[in-house]
A protein has these predicted regions:
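Binding-site signature for planar aromatic cofactors or substrates
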Residues: 1-122
Length: 122
């Protein structure tokens, strides 16, 4: 998963919902490790995803449990398409502008913890 921020190895849950005709919820539970652009494995992992100039983190999830449930309460929605706004904003900023934005906005989490985006967290 590419993050469009977290640090270290910690618990993570990813939830998938079916918004179509067949209801279903699937949850993946595990421990996640964050890979940043400064890490050796960044380039090889990034190749696994569509190009995204704004990609700042990849989460490597070691699965511990997979569960499904009925999803009967999940509403039905029709996807109209992706919004171009974020990609357009990132293209206009360019790599240097995005890095500056990350340094201003993404080095500390909402609860005041360092994200490790530019330097390793011990």
């Amino acid at each position: 998963s590419v993050s469009r921020t977290a640090s270290g190895v910690s618990r993570m849950t990813i939830m998938f919902c079916s918004f179509g005709k067949q209801p279903l919820i699937m949850r993946l539970y595990g421990r996640a490790r964050v890979v940043h652009p400064r890490d050796d494995s960044w380039a090889s992992l990034l190749e696994l995803f569509p190009a995204d100039i704004g990609a700042r983190q990849i989460f490597r999830l070691s699965l511990e449990l997979v569960q499904t449930s009925c999803g009967y309460a999940v509403p039905r929605y029709e996807l109209k398409g992706e919004r171009p706004t974020l990609a357009s904003w990132a293209e206009k900023k360019g790599p240097e502008g995005i890095e500056q934005y990350w340094r201003e906005k993404n080095t500390v989490s909402l609860d005041g913890k360092p994200t490790g985006l530019f330097e390793a967290i011990d």
